[in-house]
A protein has these predicted regions:
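Surface-exposed cleft-lining segments at the edges of enzyme active sites
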Residues: 86-92, 155-161, 184-192
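Structural beta-sheet core signal
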Residues: 182, 218-219
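Short, charged, amphipathic alpha-helix that recurs within catalytic cores of restriction-modification
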Residues: 194-210
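Conserved catalytic cores of phosphodiester-cleaving nucleases, focusing on short active-site segments
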Residues: 107, 170-188
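Nuclease-adjacent, charged terminal/linker segments that flank catalytic cores
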Residues: 1-110, 119-121
Length: 231
């Protein structure tokens, strides 16, 4: 309640300024979202400073940041609605947009030690897989002619792969205790998501081929009977 009150005061100030302008409702909505986000980031920075000076533990800091952020989302939705009424689909989509960064806070301010990492480059992964396969073929007790034929057949499917079109980057990648976690966040499912589902299956299969240190996680907001067919 305290954080909601704090953000509503900021929202009132922003709204008072916007009502004096001739901006469109679209521009006013964007400005509200932008200004409240900036205000929230400033408050989070202040919390970090206080946490260090008062030696907060990670759990205490994360809890306060989650409360602060949740309050900012409530006010952001309220004040955007004051200048431009939400339609049902626009509201549902906006909730999905806010859900992912809210979940990521637990990884940006972790309780247990972890390291955010960049996803691997597909060309490098492809080279590694090819080298492993060729090394295995070379180790077989076969004639050079048969080995060459095996390599030729092995190369055929790779010629059908457009390396530039396969991006291994998901919504979140982190390393913890020697394990690489590759995570994607899905709020809901709509008719245009089938291609994305197929991509996720492809990317997950590539990570699985890299060995036991790769773990894939899919975070979903809605259950299957509530419009999430990723499950």
């Amino acid at each position: 309640a305290e954080w909601i009150s704090t953000f509503r005061k900021a929202g009132d100030s922003i709204l008072a300024e916007l009502y004096k302008t001739k901006k469109s409702k679209n521009d006013k909505a964007s400005e509200i979202n932008k200004r409240i986000k900036e205000y929230r980031e400033g408050k989070i920075a202040n919390l970090n400073t206080v946490a260090k000076s008062e030696s907060w533990d990670n759990q205490t800091l994360l809890n306060e940041i989650l409360l602060l952020t949740y309050a900012s989302y409530i006010v952001m939705l309220e004040y955007r609605n004051k200048v431009w009424k939400y339609e049902y689909m626009a509201f549902a989509r906006r909730i999905g947009e806010l859900w992912e960064p809210f979940c990521k806070l637990a990884f940006d301010f972790p309780i247990k030690k972890l390291t955010l990492v960049d996803p691997p480059d597909f060309d490098e992964v492809q080279t590694q897989i090819k080298n492993d396969a060729i090394g295995y073929i070379e180790s077989l007790d076969l004639s050079e002619e048969i080995k060459a034929e095996l390599k030729r057949h092995y190369d055929i499917p790779w010629t059908m792969v457009d390396s530039g079109g396969i991006k291994l980057g998901l919504d979140l990648h982190f390393e913890q205790n020697g394990i690489h976690y590759n995570c994607d966040f899905k709020s809901g499912f709509s008719s245009n998501e089938k291609g994305n589902t197929n991509r996720l299956l492809l990317v997950a299969s590539i990570y699985n081929s890299l060995g036991e240190i790769e773990k894939n996680i899919l975070f979903v907001r809605q259950t299957e009977d509530e419009n999430n067919h990723y499950l």
